[in-house]
Amino acid sequence: MKKLSTLFAAVLLAVTVFGASVVPASAQSQKGGRSAASERVSQPVNLAVLIQDDLVSRVGNELRVTAEFIRALPQGSTVMVGYIRSGSLQVRQPFTNDLGTAAGALRIPVGSTSASPYNPYVQVRDAIKLFPAGGANRNALLLISDGLDTSRGFDYSSSVDSIDLNRAVREAKNRGVSVYSFYAPSAGLTSFDSRAVSFGQSALNRVSNETGGRAFFQGTGFVTFNAYFSRLAKTLNEQGGRAY
């Protein structure tokens, strides 16, 4: 009888420990689903993706993750794709709710100083004017750029407090567009001049912070975009949650 009681106690202990340490597969799946969902934008958005056309060739390797981000946007979103070139904004895809078509409009940047703009902010302002009026979607512009403005000199004031940057900020505020930016070096000054990098990143910080967006960069060199897109989605979701 004593042996039977001892055996029963051992079995009961094993069941208790086993039950406490195993999470049902359904619960694990739900937990994993919540984690994945937190890296995707949860509410429809009007998104303009602007890429500076003289960025280093490595930016071309980020087209896949950029396209995946676009295709993963929620139903009801619209996307525009454009390239910032010397003196012009090349709109590859006007705003469309066909996310696959928008993703397909991405192309590898020219990656040459022949395409270098004096600054990206004239074309940013032009793109802001193309956002659809009205509607319930939030308006966001993703600027992939080195941020550098040399149109009126090469010093901190001319680059970070430039006329065109200030005009872009005013236009964004008037039209309710938040600017988010990913830093990447260009084939020009920001590929070798640390002061140019500092000016460009500071300008991206300004245009993003003053329009309710956020700038993403790490150090002074090129960083792949995977982590940036995860943080961008998280930021959009957090800001969207506060807005509703």
Whereabouts are the PLM-identified features?
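Exposed acidic/Ser/Thr-rich ligand/metal-binding surfaces
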Residues: 34, 45-48, 64-67, 100-180, ...
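Boundary at the C-terminal end of the N-terminal hydrophobic targeting segment
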Residues: 19, 24-29
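Bacterial N-terminal signal peptides that target proteins for export
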Residues: 1-11
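Von Willebrand factor
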Residues: 40-95, 123-124, 139-144, 182
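Bacterial N-terminal signal peptides
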Residues: 9-20
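Short beta-strand-loop
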Residues: 70, 79-108, 130-132, 191-204
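C-terminal "exit" segments of structured domains
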Residues: 198, 218-244
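Solvent-exposed loop/turn segments at secondary-structure junctions
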Residues: 53-57, 85-90, 99, 109-116, ...
